[in-house]
Amino acid sequence: MVGAQLGLETVVSAIFDGSGDYAKTDHEAKFQIHRTFEGLLQQLLSLKWTEPSLIVIHGHYLDSLGLYLRHYPDVVASVVNKLFELLTSLPITIQGPSNNSRQARLQICSSFIRISRAADKALLPHMKNIADTMAYLQGEGRLLRAEHDHLCEAFLIMASSSGNRKSWPGYLNLLTKHGPKWNGKLHTCLTHLA
């Protein structure tokens, strides 16, 4: 399954990498490509795996479609919701002999980072919902510090993709509920981005 995921990532990159070839593709071919990837995405969204190692692979398949999401932002909300569903389906394990769930949870948070980089501006309209979900999970004690930090890093990548420095304070305000430690980090990061 891992080999197929790498193959998918290669195909998605070859088609949607921004080289301009896809933009020049005729409408009918674009429609067929979109339908193919949309069908694949629907299959991925409908999966209900519960084993941590399979959830990691599931997350990798979803983040392989990041460049596709850049061109078809109407499906971004479904992917974001699925990633949060995968994250919360795994138990929080702070200590114990098995840290498979903890590693899988971190990998799902890393998928947010990879999708943020690849999907570019497609995630901007979803930032408030992402921040609200992060705050909710944090408030419920269902988000570990390392997971929170990964998600905040993804959030910063999303904010920087806007390219509009004037909008960064608004993005910063979305995360102010995440505590003074992150507020300082966000101010520092946004200053460096400016």
Q: For each predicted feature, which ranges?
A:
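Karyopherin-beta/Importin-beta family HEAT-repeat alpha-solenoid scaffold
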Residues: M1-A194
